[in-house]
Amino acid sequence: MMNDKKITSFIALPDLLSMLNASSGYLSILLSIDGSLNAACILMLLAVLFDSLDGWVARKTGRIDIHGFGKNMDSLSDVISFGVAPAILIYSAAVDFRYINILVGPLIVLCGILRLSRFNVLTGGGKNFTGLPIPVAAVTISSFYLTGFYSELSAAFIMIAVSVLMISSIEYPRVDGMGASTALILIIATIISVAAVEILQAASVVAGPVAIILFIATLTYIAVPILPKRDVI
């Protein structure tokens, strides 16, 4: 049992990245409320990057999370960035069907909490996740909004499906190696291209197409485990 109860005795380098994840999610929420939705999407994608890095840093530094502090930090941060932030975004983006997104928003948050709670109590790593990983919710809605083809009803339908898949028992593969690198490159490219449009007022000839590629890649990841398997003869 740990006798030292000082908060600093629990915190390791990966936890600082989890804090950056949570901070990005919080800022995304503020920007959505303020109506700066492109910037809110950028902050959500930035949170995904920090979330990816905290696990990588934990493995590289050989962290032994005996008391589960890091796991809980990660999950609590994820609720903010990948549960609450997407819910606030779709509500803030709604004009004609706001009442629908009032109902969809809590569904995203609650299913995200259930998904993370189950993840925390299940032991062992394995090659697959049980249920859709919650960061996918943030990547899905932010990339969809940034495509320039955002639709309130389509967003509501997609996020309902994502929420249900998070609490499903469908096995989703852990993305690592080349797949992880490609995903991170797409996310970074989307962040940079949209930021250039927002900050430099540059022409959005790149931002839209990059976001479309990221959105399609995310939908592919979501759909593949659901599609019926064909027997190879």
Swiss-Prot record:
Q: Does the keyword Transmembrane helix apply?
A: yes
What reactions does this protein catalyze?
A: CDP-2,3-bis-O-(geranylgeranyl)-sn-glycerol + L-serine = archaetidylserine + CMP + H(+); CDP-2,3-bis-O-(phytanyl)-sn-glycerol + L-serine = 2,3-bis-O-phytanyl-sn-glycero-3-phospho-L-serine + CMP + H(+)
Q: Which InterPro entries match?
A: CDP-diaglyc--ser_O-PTrfase, CDP-OH_P_trans, CDP-OH_PTrfase_TM_dom
Report TM segments.
7-27, 29-49, 75-95, 102-122, 126-146, 147-167, 180-200, 206-226
Q: Which GO terms describe its cellular component?
A: membrane
Pathway(s) it belongs to: Membrane lipid metabolism; glycerophospholipid metabolism
> What membrane topology does this protein have?
Multi-pass membrane protein
Q: How does activity depend on pH?
A: Optimum pH is between 8 and 8.5.
Q: Name one Pfam family in it.
A: CDP-OH_P_transf
User: What role does it play?
Assistant: Involved in the lipid biosynthesis. Catalyzes the formation of unsaturated archaetidylserine from CDP-unsaturated archaeol and L-serine. Activity with ester-linked substrate analogs containing straight aliphatic chains (typical bacterial substrates) is two to three times higher than that with the corresponding ether-type substrate (typical archaeal substrates). Both enantiomers of CDP-unsaturated archaeols with ether-linked geranylgeranyl chains and CDP-saturated archaeol with ether-linked phytanyl chains are similarly active.
Protein name stated in the entry: Archaetidylserine synthase
Q: Which organism is it from?
A: Methanothermobacter thermautotrophicus (strain ATCC 29096 / DSM 1053 / JCM 10044 / NBRC 100330 / Delta H) (Methanobacterium thermoautotrophicum)
